[in-house]
Amino acid sequence: MLKPLGDRVVLKFEAEKEQTVGGFVLAASHKEATKVGTVVAVSETGIRTITGDIVPPSVAVGDKVLVEYGSGLEVKDGDQELVICREADILAVLA
């Protein structure tokens, strides 16, 4: 398993769906703008501010998140396709 450093997180993206849970069909431009993923690993350290304080990660393993399409670096870990991105690339945590 990958262990991210600094402010990075490891995500596994879900297969893209044609419809949302509410039954709405998403426009092709919207599907390419964002992606939904699950956090599979989070840095243990977080980020250091200018004053030297450490800010812990605001996401946890298992959170479903929305990220901008194309964010991060695609990597393979065994047979899994994962993405390593910065926490700042995460747009929202889905409830």
From Swiss-Prot:
Keywords: Chaperone, Cytoplasm, Stress response. It comes from Streptococcus equi subsp. zooepidemicus (strain MGCS10565). The gene is groES. GO terms for biological process: chaperone cofactor-dependent protein refolding. It comes from the Bacteria. Heptamer of 7 subunits arranged in a ring. Interacts with the chaperonin GroEL. This is Co-chaperonin GroES. GO terms for cellular component: cytoplasm. Together with the chaperonin GroEL, plays an essential role in assisting protein folding. The GroEL-GroES system forms a nano-cage that allows encapsulation of the non-native substrate proteins and provides a physical environment optimized to promote and accelerate protein folding. GroES binds to the apical surface of the GroEL ring, thereby capping the opening of the GroEL channel. GO terms for molecular function: ATP binding; metal ion binding; protein folding chaperone; protein-folding chaperone binding; unfolded protein binding. Belongs to the GroES chaperonin family. InterPro entries: Chaperonin_GroES, Chaperonin_GroES_sf, Chaprnonin_Cpn10_CS, GroES-like_sf. It is found in: Cytoplasm. HAMAP family: CH10.
